[in-house]
UniProtKB/Swiss-Prot annotation:
It is found in: Cytoplasm, Nucleoid. It comes from the Bacteria. InterPro entries: YbaB-like_sf, YbaB/EbfC. One of its GO terms (cellular component) is cytosol. This is Nucleoid-associated protein BRADO0764. HAMAP family: DNA_YbaB_EbfC (MF_00274). Homodimer.
Length: 106
């Protein structure tokens, strides 16, 4: 019975920590860049895009395809960084609770 109560307490702690982490992820910002800095995408670790910066040299009709490719690349770079920030927070939580890495998280 004590084991069950301990597990319930641990589950409640995990839920509380997860809620805290979700709030924190909204404040963590990462920036993805492409084209040597010609395009930058800033987003939160919750994957909310905050801003997109484009070098004026790319704002020409003949540069449209290049700009599109750079935007996709910068967004992908920012997404990977946001996912890494999320994983880091998750590992900090599961480590403190003595759970194995990746426990219950895709």
């Amino acid at each position: 019975m004590a084991d069950f109560l301990g597990m319930m307490k641990q589950a409640a702690q995990l839920q509380s920590k997860m809620q805290e982490m979700q709030a924190e992820l909204g404040n963590v910002e990462v920036e993805g860049i492409s084209g040597g800095g010609l395009v930058a995408v800033r987003m939160t670790a919750k994957m909310d895009v905050k801003s997109i910066k484009i070098d004026p040299s790319l704002l020409k009709p003949e540069e449209a395809e290049i700009l599109e490719d750079l935007l996709v690349t910068a967004h992908g770079d920012a997404r990977r960084k946001a996912e890494a920030a999320m994983q880091e927070k998750m590992q900090a939580i599961t480590g403190k609770l003595g759970l194995p890495p990746g426990f219950g998280f895709g």
